A protein has these predicted regions:
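N-terminal strand-loop element at the rim of the active site
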Residues: 7-14, 27-83, 321
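Membrane-proximal helix-turn-helix segments that form the acceptor-binding/catalytic region
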Residues: 93, 134, 146-166
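Carbohydrate-associated surface elements
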Residues: 172, 192
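Nucleotide-activated donor-binding/catalytic signature segment of Leloir-type glycosyltransferases, i.e.
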Residues: 261-278
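Short alpha-helical donor nucleotide-sugar binding micro-motif in glycosyltransferases
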Residues: 277-278, 286-290
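Short hydrophobic beta-strand element within catalytic cores of glycosyltransferases
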Residues: 316-319
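Conserved acidic donor-binding segment of nucleotide-sugar-dependent glycosyltransferases
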Residues: 330-342, 349-355
Length: 391
């Protein structure tokens, strides 16, 4: 079986979707009778796409954001899988035509591309993976509301109506897709995550951050954007520091349009450390150095990697009670789910005061995540859809 895992965004961008593409292609290609390759648009396309994307979000484009991981590192992680880049849509159509099935993200960009520029009838069956939330719950900003309007509109339904099926990751997205696309094959399978393997990486990696072992170390990691709750993070820091500044230190890993605000907070507070982007190979060691991980995402996640990564190192997590996070965190077991900013602050103080959850977090997350089972389910769905489409 030949599978193309397609994403317009190049793998060097090193986001969650790109990480999924690499891991999934590598695992599937290691199985007998399966060849899964990553296919993206080329560097020139990504530069233009990145500029337009930044313009849409009213921010300056930073070229470095599409080159966070080297091609050499990517190809090493891919194993037997290949990485193909296409310069134009004619070249892309030809490349995708060599496969039996295409797996693509559900972004409206890809839906428009397949419907208007390539043509669903000119390529093998396409499955959309909902790695972008189909609908943000509690959306409060202009862009999140516009996203919800677009993705639940007749326009998106028309652009995606020729897909062979949907792979959803969260329960919320599965329900939304089933309402909008009645009768379509929809499966919910969590993104594969190897908790044991991730913890092993921490033993081999050098710590990318320096910590004060006498302090309670709080880690935050992600893109510095409104969606990820940077404004809430900064407010939480201010409130916790009012009473616990001498006991805690904050380590913020990531970059984005709100990097300046984080840098300003680091200048204001001696216990706030802004580390910028940390490469994926080094992040396990950053989690291992922390006492608590916090996620301030606001509108829901399809698949929150960071809480699982933290848990795999035995680190508890505090997040808001939103979709994605509340499917990973069992409140009071491997972390706490806050229903308000006040609760979030109190949970952090509770941990900083020396309190601990009474469970084995590492053991718990290993039970909740089974990478082999997830890959098996995903491949079975691919096979079922291919058999159905060929009848």
């Amino acid at each position: 079986m030949r599978i193309a895992i397609f994403n317009t965004v190049q793998l060097e961008t090193a986001g969650g979707m790109e990480h999924f593409c690499i891991q999934t292609a590598a695992h599937l290609s290691s199985l007998p009778g399966v060849q899964a390759d990553c296919v993206t648009m080329d560097d020139a396309f990504n530069l233009r796409y990145g500029q337009l994307h930044s313009l849409y979000f009213l921010r300056l484009f930073d070229r470095s954001t599409i080159y966070r991981e080297s091609r050499e590192s990517i190809e090493s992680r891919l194993g037997q899988a290949r990485y193909l880049k296409c310069a134009n849509f004619r070249e892309l159509t030809q490349a995708l035509g060599r496969y039996e099935l295409i797996y693509s993200r559900n972004e409206i960009t890809e839906a428009f591309l397949f419907h208007n520029l390539i043509g669903y009838d000119r390529v093998p069956p396409v499955i959309f993976g909902c790695h972008c939330p189909h609908r943000y719950i509690g959306a409060s900003t202009l862009h999140s509301r516009l996203h919800n309007l677009l993705y639940t509109s007749p326009l998106y339904t028309r652009l995606a109506k020729r897909v062979a099926g949907f792979h959803t990751i969260s329960g919320g997205d599965r329900a939304a897709i089933e309402r909008q696309f009645p009768g379509y094959p929809v499966v919910q399978i969590p993104n594969p995550f190897d908790a044991i393997g991730y913890a092993d990486q921490a033993k081999r990696a050098e710590a990318p951050i320096t910590v004060d072992r006498a302090k309670f170390k709080i880690l935050w990691a992600g893109r510095l954007t409104r969606q990820k709750g940077v404004a809430q993070l900064l407010e939480i820091i201010e409130r916790v520091n009012e009473s616990h500044a001498d006991r805690v230190e904050w380590h913020i890993c990531g970059e984005g349009e709100l990097s300046r605000l984080v840098s300003e907070a680091a200048r204001r507070h001696l216990n706030v450390h802004a580390h910028g982007h940390i490469n994926r190979e080094a992040m396990p060691a950053a989690y291992a150095a922390a006492d608590l991980f916090i996620s301030t995402s606001q509108w829901g996640e399809t698949y929150a990697y960071t809480p699982r990564e933290a848990n795999s190192l035995g680190v508890p997590v505090v997040s808001y009670d939103i979709s994605g996070c509340n499917e990973i965190i069992d409140d009071g077991v491997n972390g706490r789910l806050a229903k308000s900013d006040d609760e979030f602050v109190e949970y952090i103080k509770w941990f900083a005061d020396g309190n601990r959850l009474g469970s084995d977090i590492t053991k718990h997350i290993r039970k909740k995540t089974d990478a082999t089972s997830a890959y098996r389910q995903l491949l079975r769905f691919f096979q079922d859809r291919l058999e159905s489409e060929s009848r």
